[in-house]
Amino acid sequence: MSDNSTGTTKSRSNVDDVQAHYDLSDAFFALFQDPTRTYSCAYFERDDMTLHEAQVAKLDLTLGKLGLEPGMTLLDVGCGWGSVMKRAVERYDVNVVGLTLSKNQHAYCQQVLDKVDTNRSHRVLLSDWANFSEPVDRIVTIEAIEHFGFERYDDFFKFAYNAMPADGVMLLHSITGLHVKQVIERGIPLTMEMAKFIRFIVTDIFPGGRLPTIETIEEHVTKAGFTITDIQSLQPHFARTLDLWAEALQAHKDEAIEIQSAEVYERYMKYLTGCAKAFRMGYIDCNQFTLAK
């Protein structure tokens, strides 16, 4: 891992960018999230699933790819509001460590895990992965790598590879983008409207965020020594997730404005509905990469 001044500065920048979005307000996010407080793509195994059911299905889909056994230690990089760790402890009887750069999520996760009836250890650290040096058995990271910056990918995957034993497995869940050439080859229209929307997302919603292509992920994980054993696209599932988030936020419009402001409400509605459209048009995808040592 890089320990030079540039790396340190970038880490601090990541903290600022993450907190700018995720520390907006727990109460605001709760208006459109399901009861698990999962803020990532759901998995609709059946058409009649509720958002809550689909989020639990996504947690099970994710954890089921890791080969977890009782007593193992699972590291969750970018642990959100703790739903993955909670499910892992309850269903797989493992120890969990969560890393987050969000102060609000750090406090919330600890409260969630403290309520779980288990003898396994559970810790949530307000820390960047670059400052974590303990051995773990499995690693999961869901929609976090988009905040890292491409220049940190090699260090991150090297960190993950070295943290696990010889049979280690990592589940990387990431939104992925396309090169302009790929957009053209697939016949997806290049419009000024979408260009402006992408600028809005990286400026007003996820400052500093960058989407990797599938090829970028493949390049960096194999360079670190991993073998990709499976790639699963969740593209239509994310479009539906965003639809349901937007519907829920719209249904709580007055509360959202009271908690934040009309400007924030309108900004988030634009973000949720616009991203759903981007997934349906094929500009972006969401993929789960299963990585084995």
From Swiss-Prot:
Q: Any idea which residues are catalytic in this one?
A: 275
Catalytic activity, EC:
2.1.1.-
Query: Which residues take part in binding S-adenosyl-L-methionine?
Result: 39-40, 78-80, 100-105, 129-130, 142
Q: What class of enzyme is it?
A: transferase
Task: Tell me the domain of life.
Answer: Bacteria
Q: In which pathway does it act?
A: Lipid metabolism; mycolic acid biosynthesis
GO BP annotation list? lipid biosynthetic process; methylation; mycolic acid biosynthetic process
GO MF terms listed in the record are:
cyclopropane-fatty-acyl-phospholipid synthase activity; O-methyltransferase activity
Please provide the record's keywords in A-Z order.
Lipid biosynthesis, Lipid metabolism, Methyltransferase, S-adenosyl-L-methionine, Transferase
Summarizing the function annotation, the protein's role is: Involved in the biosynthesis of methoxymycolic acid. It catalyzes the O-methylation of the hydroxy group of the hydroxymycolate to form a methyl ether.
> This chain belongs to which protein, by name?
Methoxy mycolic acid synthase MmaA3
Record gene name? mmaA3
